[in-house]
Amino acid sequence: VLLTRPERGVLNFMKNTKVLSRIRRKKGIRKRIFGTSEKPRLTVFRSAKNIYAQAIDDDEGKTLISLSTLSPEVKKEISYGGNINAAEVTGKLLNKKLKEKGVSQVVFDRNGYLFHGRIKSLADQIELKKKQ
């Protein structure tokens, strides 16, 4: 199975069934989830050492807010970005930024990842109503 990604070229996922399964789940989720400016889509990406989250307005195709464990405000509160504690801190600061922006609800997009561990701890810190 070949997948094309503009930033990385063509990737062969034949041997990496874990990545292929996540991408398959991601495509199914994205068919049903859509964000607006009043209710943006909150999507997360998880790497081995960091976690990234962004609120996206799909109507205009713009990112409203983005935050990761590499952001200076998060980095000063954590020692390592790839654990549940870092995801919780990121979620708290993201929740604060969303409230400052005037967002009352979000649609949570787990991006094909299973809803446990770092993804769940980040989502639990978002106090706005969420749907996955």
List each model region and its residues.
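Short, Lys/Arg-enriched N-terminal segments with co-localized hydrophobic residues
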Residues: V1-F13
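Ribosome large-subunit tunnel/peptidyl-transferase-proximal elements
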Residues: N12-Q132
